[in-house]
């Protein structure tokens, strides 16, 4: 038998991309049903038949007033909830009804976002080689990744399904996409985060007031991104480069955020001072990510931070001395969509890359070169992604 003509090292080098992973397109989608935060307390207590809990309703109104949210989108309509009263109780068996919603609607909303990203990318969907799908909404087999693959008509694609990750996972899908793109020459990775609050919606409880926080903050939405290394400058225009990515669990944070899937749905609880834990550790995360780059001025980078709530953003700003402008895109998404869990950071990236062109800035990162993306969620887990913007261009794509 003849000996091999190439070595393993040569094969490995041939499998790897030359340049860093890039974000090539972003698409977003929401349900049609829009709810305004100013009206939501009255609606929420009426639909859950809880108007008699007057003190709790006043507390919920104050939560909504302080949320910095103007509106949210929700698949669950008043008509649907009226027909499914078990979902309006605090602790009533309702998992079947919730599952019936999410196993259909999560991939459907993800498909709408994916189609927008494919349209912007402008390349045949047959070029998609990998799919990473993430949702905190329900579990099914075959999963939402399979359903989306079939719905889009993708033939040969390597799939990864991530269930029950929570709000940090928008950073996770980018970290995974980066690893896939840079280690598989020519790979084009589609990431999709699709979140529906049907698994978490429930009525109020006087004995579990912390559960009202999620009811005041969470909304539905899906975001999709197209990623790949070594973009073809003739037909692809990068939006951001993914420079590095890391995940960490914050010290002394066990139980800070947890969620448990039960017959009553997915019950979330906030058990500690989440804003304080994040702000206490944020500078260390920044130093670990940017010290190799010689960057220590946190106002010199653009920010994409998961908007877990206004208190988190306020305390992070105060801790590192951020100018208000740095969180503009993050606060805009919180205001217009609420907390959409894993999908949020992709919505923020989408908002950020659109605004510089409108404002006459020179890069996709608000005129700045380097940036950071943070995902915060159960664990308490933090995803940190270092980004590099690209120059704003017009006309046809050019070589990166």
Swiss-Prot record:
Transmembrane segments: none annotated. GO terms for biological process: flavonoid biosynthetic process; polyketide biosynthetic process. It comes from the Eukaryota. Keywords: Acyltransferase, Flavonoid biosynthesis, Transferase. Pfam families: Chal_sti_synt_C, Chal_sti_synt_N. Pathway: Secondary metabolite biosynthesis; flavonoid biosynthesis. Its EC number is 2.3.1.74. The active site is at 167. Belongs to the thiolase-like superfamily. Chalcone/stilbene synthases family. The primary product of this enzyme is 4,2',4',6'-tetrahydroxychalcone (also termed naringenin-chalcone or chalcone) which can under specific conditions spontaneously isomerize into naringenin. This is Chalcone synthase WHP1. It comes from Zea mays (Maize). The lineage of its organism: Eukaryota, Viridiplantae, Streptophyta, Embryophyta, Tracheophyta.
């Amino acid at each position: 038998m003849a000996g091999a003509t190439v070595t393993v090292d040569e094969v490995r080098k041939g499998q790897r991309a030359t340049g860093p992973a890039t974000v090539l397109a972003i698409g977003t989608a929401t349900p049609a049903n829009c709810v305004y935060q100013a009206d939501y307390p009255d609606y929420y207590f009426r639909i859950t038949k809880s108007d008699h809990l007057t003190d709790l309703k006043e507390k919920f109104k104050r939560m909504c007033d302080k949320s910095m949210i103007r509106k949210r989108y929700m698949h669950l309509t008043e008509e649907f909830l009226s027909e499914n009263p078990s979902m309006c109780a605090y602790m009533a068996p309702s998992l079947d009804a919730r599952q019936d919603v999410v196993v259909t609607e999560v991939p459907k909303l993800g498909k709408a976002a994916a189609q927008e990203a494919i349209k912007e990318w402008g390349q045949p969907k047959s070029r998609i080689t990998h799919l990473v799908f993430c949702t905190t909404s329900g579990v099914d087999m075959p999963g939402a990744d399979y359903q989306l693959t079939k719905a889009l008509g993708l033939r040969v694609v390597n799939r990864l399904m991530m269930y029950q990750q929570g709000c940090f996972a928008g950073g996770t899908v980018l970290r995974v996409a980066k690893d896939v793109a840079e280690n598989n020459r020519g790979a084009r990775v589609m990431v999709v985060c699709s979140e529906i609050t049907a698994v978490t919606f429930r009525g109020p409880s006087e004995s579990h007031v912390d559960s009202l926080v999620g009811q005041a903050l969470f909304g539905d939405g899906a975001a999709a991104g197209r990623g790949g290394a070594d973009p073809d400058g003739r037909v692809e225009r990068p939006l951001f480069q993914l420079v590095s990515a890391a995940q960490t669990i914050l010290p002394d944070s066990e139980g800070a955020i947890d969620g448990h899937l039960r017959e009553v749905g997915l019950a979330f609880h906030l058990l500690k001072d989440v804003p304080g834990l994040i702000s206490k550790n944020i500078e260390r995360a920044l130093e670990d990510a940017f010290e190799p780059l010689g960057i220590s001025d946190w106002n010199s980078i653009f920010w994409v931070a998961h908007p877990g709530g206004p208190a988190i953003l306020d305390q992070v700003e105060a801790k590192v001395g951020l100018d208000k402008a740095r969180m503009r895109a993050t606060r805009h998404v919180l205001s217009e969509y609420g907390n959409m869990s894993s999908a949020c950071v992709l919505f923020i990236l989408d908002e950020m890359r659109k605004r510089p062109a409108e404002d006459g800035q020179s890069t996709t990162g608000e005129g700045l070169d380097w940036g950071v993306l943070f995902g915060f969620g159960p664990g308490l887990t933090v995803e940190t992604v270092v980004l590099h913007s690209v120059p704003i261009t017009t006309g046809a794509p050019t070589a990166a």
